[in-house]
C-alpha cells in the first residue's frame, strides 16, 4: 500500500506562516490492537508534519522540531530523535510495528520528561494517541503522571498536552491526568483520520498566532466525535450479460471484476 507523501504535495491553499517556535512530540500507541490503523496513523502524522513544514518554510525565521515516540509494552517504548521539521522523513506503514500491550503511563511520563528537558522556554505540543487503556506500565501510574502534568503547567505555561483516544476509557484517562475538555477528545474507531485532522488544525491555529497554546475548540470536538462515513459512490445500473454457450465466449467475457480495481503499489523502505 502506497502511503501518500503529504509532506511533498503542493497544496494550492496557502497557510498562515508561523509566528513562534514550536517543538512537537507525537506519543503514538503501536500496541497489537493498532495493526489495522497503521495506514490512518501514518497518513495522519504525515498530514500534521506536512502542514508544519509549510508554515515554517522560508522566509519564516522561526523553527520547529518533531520527535516521535512509539510505545506498546513497558519494554517497547521507542523514543525517536528530535529533529528539525524539514528533516522529518515521510512515515510509512512499515515504520509502525504494532505488537504487545499498552504502557500508557510510562510513555506519557517519558514524553513529559523529554518536553521539559528539550523545550524549556519554548512552546511545545505533545499529542498522545491511543486506542486502549493502560495495561502494562511498570514505572509510572496515572497519579504520578497527573502530578507531572500539573508541575509542567506551572513551570511551562507554553506547553500543551493533548490526549486523543478511541477507547471508552479515553475521557476518564484524560480527566485522571488533569486534562480538560479542550485538551482531549474521544473519537470513534472509524474516526481515526478525522482525529488527526483536528489535531492538525489545532496546531496550525497555535503556531500562526490565533491561539496562545494548542487546544481543541468546540468544532474540533464535534467533528471528531461525529460518526464518519465513507463517501458513497452510486453504482452503475446492472446490465445483464448476453447468454453465450462456452463455444461463443470471447476472451473479454472472462474478464474479472477485479480488473477495475487499481493495482496495489508496494513501497520499499
Regions found by a protein language model. Give the residues of each.
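Acidic, low-complexity intrinsically disordered regions
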Residues: 1-269
Amino acid at each position: 500500500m502506497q502511503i501518500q507523501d503529504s509532506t511533498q504535495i503542493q497544496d494550492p491553499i496557502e497557510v498562515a506562516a508561523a509566528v513562534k517556535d514550536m517543538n512537537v512530540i507525537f506519543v503514538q500507541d503501536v500496541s497489537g490492537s493498532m495493526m489495522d490503523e497503521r495506514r490512518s496513523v501514518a497518513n495522519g502524522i504525515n498530514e500534521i508534519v506536512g502542514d508544519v513544514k509549510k508554515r515554517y518554510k522560508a522566509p519564516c525565521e522561526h523553527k520547529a522540531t518533531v520527535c516521535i515516540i512509539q510505545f506498546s509494552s513497558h519494554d517497547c517504548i521507542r523514543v525517536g530523535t528530535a529533529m528539525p521539521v524539514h528533516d522529518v522523513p515521510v512515515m510509512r506503514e512499515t515504520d509502525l510495528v504494532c505488537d504487545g500491550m499498552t504502557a500508557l503511563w510510562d510513555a506519557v511520563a517519558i514524553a513529559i520528561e523529554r518536553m521539559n528537558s528539550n523545550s524549556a522556554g519554548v512552546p511545545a505540543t505533545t499529542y498522545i494517541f491511543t486506542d486502549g487503556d493502560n495495561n502494562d506500565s511498570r514505572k509510572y501510574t496515572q497519579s504520578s503522571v497527573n502530578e507531572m502534568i500539573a508541575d509542567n503547567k506551572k513551570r511551562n505555561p507554553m506547553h500543551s498536552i493533548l490526549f486523543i483516544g478511541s477507547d471508552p476509557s479515553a475521557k476518564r484517562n484524560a480527566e485522571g491526568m488533569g486534562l480538560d475538555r479542550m485538551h482531549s477528545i474521544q473519537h470513534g474507531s472509524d474516526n481515526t483520520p478525522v482525529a488527526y485532522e483536528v489535531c492538525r488544525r489545532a496546531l496550525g491555529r497555535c503556531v500562526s498566532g490565533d491561539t496562545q497554546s494548542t487546544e481543541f475548540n468546540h468544532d474540533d470536538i464535534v467533528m471528531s466525535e461525529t460518526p464518519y462515513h465513507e463517501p458513497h459512490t452510486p453504482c452503475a445500473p446492472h446490465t445483464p450479460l448476453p447468454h453465450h454457450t462456452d463455444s461463443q465466449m470471447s476472451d473479454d467475457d472472462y474478464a474479472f471484476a477485479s480488473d477495475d480495481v487499481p493495482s496495489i503499489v508496494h513501497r520499499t523502505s
